[in-house]
Amino acid sequence: MSSSTVPAAGAAAAMLLVGTSTAVSATIADYPVLSGQALRYALAAAILLAVVRHRRLPRAGLTYRDVLLLLALAATGLAGFNIFLVEATRHASPAVIGTVVGAIPIVLALVGPLTERRRPAARIVGAAVVVTLGAAVAAGFGGGSLRGVLLSLGALAGEVAFSLLALPLLPKLGPLRVAAYPAALAVPMLLAAGIALDGTSSLRLPTPTEAVAFGYLGVLVTATAFFLWYDALRRLGAARAGLFAGLVPAGALVTTVALGLGEAGVADVAGALIVGAGVLIGLRQPAQTGLDGQADRRVPRSPAEDEQPVPTAPERQ
């Protein structure tokens, strides 16, 4: 089995899980959005921190730089992303938002290597363009105002920050802690934003159906997917891991069809096939070279953690 097979499978699983949130979120459409995200992250943080404690990982002393990075990650990649996304839906169609945010593979393919003082690999950039094209075909292009596009770009920036701000933290803290700490920090940020935008009416108990949906989102789409993503990010690097972000529409499509909420159209299937082709192009390893034809510069493992998966509670993003 290739050394990249396991992290690649983890990245694919993470993005497919994130994609399922689209259909599941339809069941909580009447719940205040930002407060709901705070509830989801609180559940995920509780699970991840419990796993950290159960595994008795060595203490990792946080420097001021670590704390600032964690706060920035929570503020931009989690809270900021959700705020921009919610506001964007008021000024642009879901297709526009999906197409803009779907450019994440290209951005990571270009910016990821630059953060490591390397030139972007032409093959990975080309693969990212193919993946983004596939995501755009699946999402459609829709319509929206300039403000909606700008807000969508803000959500895209949050997605980029979610990965790039984690890179310097992963060698020291490992994927479990990097998934857990920002999730916990984002909870008060989202609660405050929810109260500011919707008032105290945003604070209410979920119905039983909503509670089940939040349980799924918190346990699988957040706790599990975040861990899998950060583990893959550490082992594949931002450019190659970013290719798998194109699988989000595929996850949404499968869940929508499975739940009987819609049917798979020609554009959906074509987009998924294009995304798959782009991922395969990006994962193909040139003979006798590193992953991108250069020295392999993946993020080293944390001495505090191995790659054990997150234990999941029975029926526990």
What spans do the regions from the language model cover?
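Glycine-/small-residue-enriched transmembrane alpha-helix faces in small-molecule transporters
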Residues: 1-38, 44, 83, 87, ...
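Juxtamembrane helix-entry segments on the extracytoplasmic side of multipass membrane proteins
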Residues: 3-7, 30-38, 62-67, 140-161, ...
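Helix-helix packing/entry segments at the starts of transmembrane helices
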Residues: 11-15, 39, 96-103, 164-188, ...
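Cytoplasmic-side transmembrane-helix entry/capping segments in multi-pass membrane proteins
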Residues: 11, 63-73, 119-131, 149-152, ...
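Specific transmembrane alpha-helical segments of multi-pass solute transporters/efflux pumps
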Residues: 17-22, 49-97, 101, 130, ...
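Hydrophobic transmembrane alpha-helices of multi-pass small-molecule transport proteins
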Residues: 48, 103, 120-140, 157, ...
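Hydrophobic/small/kink-forming positions within alpha-helical transmembrane segments
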Residues: 19, 23, 74-79, 83, ...
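Specific alpha-helical transmembrane segments that line the substrate/conduction pathway
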Residues: 35-46, 76-78, 82-119, 152-155, ...
